[in-house]
Amino acid sequence: MNTNTRVTLLLGAGLLLAAPSPAAAQYFGRNSVQYETFHFKVLKTQHFDVYYYEKETEAAAQAARMAERWYARISNVLRHQLTGRQPLILYADHPDFEQTNVLGSSPGEGTGGVTESLKRRIILPMGASLWETDHVIGHELIHAFQYDITGVGRSNMGAGLNRIPLWFIEGMAEYLSIGPVDPNTTMWMRDAVRRGELPKFQELVSPRYFPYRWGQAFWAYMGGVYGDDIVGALLRSAGRTGNVQGALEVMTHRPVDSIVAEWHRSLVESTEPVALATGVVLPTDRTQVQQAREMPVTTAGARLLVGPGRVLHYNIAPALSADG
């Protein structure tokens, strides 16, 4: 799932491997509060050991089929077979998931899934819909492939993995699990084009640019131009050296600034028809860019969810009522 909590766990666990003290690895889950006792069973498939308990028996069988389907897709794109069997630990709901003792701490409420590096275990709760569960399984399995390809958890751990930026790692997981067309990411890109805030390559690591959305958009461009074979090739190269820019330039035979400039151009070109249809003027020079950045939100339209006098209120995931 797209949460900063899971990102920290993803990379933080990898960094623990190089730490001098093994305490964090030895005492996984010692501070997790457990209100229930889960009696896990194991469902074995061709590539997975799926851990589940009684009340999620039927859902676990569905998740196992999803996982095998994702394995076939990802292994084909990345040209890689995982070393050994892949553990997949399922919880029936999020409150159960928060009691897991697999991790060093309890996952937060916004965490949709975790892939830890020490044993390459995927841990996740069943989602509110089959689509959500399917997406999270795919996203987390891609992280398992990233670990395996770069050697995390083994003695030959890729020396540069801890220097690979989040937009590269999480963007790849989003691109391969959602695809190149995503309304959510498209919304982010259109807004950035409208405000003239397309980042330079070096700025992609800034917290200002959410790694999931910007990373997915960049990978969608790379896959569209160079084909998906470049995804695994870039991962292997960057994993060996920790130098994403160098890997990009070697694989494409082009300077990274040229790649990013064409990516920006493609974002603008894809936004122009929508801007024309909605009467939005896209900025074309520095003055217009600055004006767009300073544009108050109210000029874009009337407030629909927060009225006058309620400036301290906010809405999370609002939805239209079916009955009006």
What are these regions (language model features)?
Residues 12-13, 22-23, 177:
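Cleavable N-terminal signal peptides
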Residues 25-165, 182-184, 202-204, 244-247:
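Juxtacatalytic substrate-recognition/specificity segment
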